[in-house]
Amino acid sequence: MSKIVKVIGREIIDSRGNPTVEAEVHLEGGFVGMAAAPSGASTGSREALELRDGDKSRYMGKGVLKAVGAVNGPIAQAVLGKDAKDQAGIDKIMIDLDGTENKSNFGANAILAVSLATAKAAAASKGQALFEHIAELNGTPGKYSMPVPMMNIINGGEHADNNVDIQEFMIQPVGAKSLKEAVRMGSEVFHNLAKVLKAKGMNTAVGDEGGYAPNLGSNAEALAVIAEAVKAAGYELGTDITLAMDCAASEFYKDGKYVLAGEGNKAFTSEEFTHFLEDLTKQYPIVSIEDGLDESDWDGFAYQTKVLGDKIQLVGDDLFVTNTKILKEGIDKGIVNSILIKFNQIGSLTETLAAIKMAKDAGYTAVISHRSGETEDATIADLAVGTAAGQIKTGSMSRSDRVAKYNQLIRIEEALGEKAPYNGRKEIKGQ
């Protein structure tokens, strides 16, 4: 009953108004799975390739008709008649047929959309929720947890048009007793932050991920206004709510230095920027820092891990690009202590699950993440619960492309009850 009988690819629109790939996988018995590939703004150089058409007469060259053509043509032909429950087998067929190291023939956007749609169709054929099926694929059936959210409430860097260098300033409601309560706490801080910014005469327009993008005088000022909002919402900073940052440092790495516009265009060495971050962690309860240096600055990361690695969570995103080969090298060298998981960086569900497992086996944490270009597809919510990853990063408390994931988590928590605990601070490395 889980044999693939039809595969359909189409071009749809993401949250930035750019095209992306959506796939449908149809099985015998009428079961259907549908999924869409997300898209990033600040991308690691070693990510699997997102195939764009380059035809300037359509969508400024960002069309995905080539990738859609791959779904409707060679991919569909290769997987027809195959068992959708054999996720690893389906993914291997597509990867082998593509034949490139970085999926540049069909595009990771094509392969991923079919990979996720296959998982959804297989879950439907088994009468399961997607998170249940993912837990089985992961070799951890029935083992679930609700993730602690990292809520990106102030956007800077590539995600906003302002003078803040650090790309994301996030809150983590570690003191919540449930995911539902964590969402409420996040929402209340988000709305209080709007009041704080308005009172200072600042802009409350939102960036790509639904957070505010005010023109602040410095990076530290972003932390200060969030601290004010947490207090105004009636919560205690450091106890109820902790802070996290995504530096996306590759975006301001120039000629071997970290050049920060928000700090008067000061140029920092790797060591100096590490101590700049360390100073911020002493002033504010920052428990997680992502991409604190450039993706190629491995010596710098070794130093940063030595200085901060036993105190806080250091997350590799552009550094590892959800790639087990690169992650293994990082683990062997003791670089950072956590990985950000974005399944479009690697391009299939099977490879994503392998990266999560490798990280956990090495004592690293795994943070499941959206991209800045998203759709209503909420698969990452099921991925976070089904792998018991422990943390999720899916934007702020606005924009339906972000909220879709929180709402799916609320539904899953309701369905699972005590089978999926919300573990709060314990999920964060170093806490």
Curated annotation (Swiss-Prot):
It comes from the Bacteria. GO terms for biological process: glycolytic process. It is an enzyme of class 4 (lyase). One of its GO terms (molecular function) is magnesium ion binding. Its EC number is 4.2.1.11. Its cofactor is Mg(2+). Component of the RNA degradosome, a multiprotein complex involved in RNA processing and mRNA degradation. This is Enolase. It comes from Enterobacter sp. (strain 638).
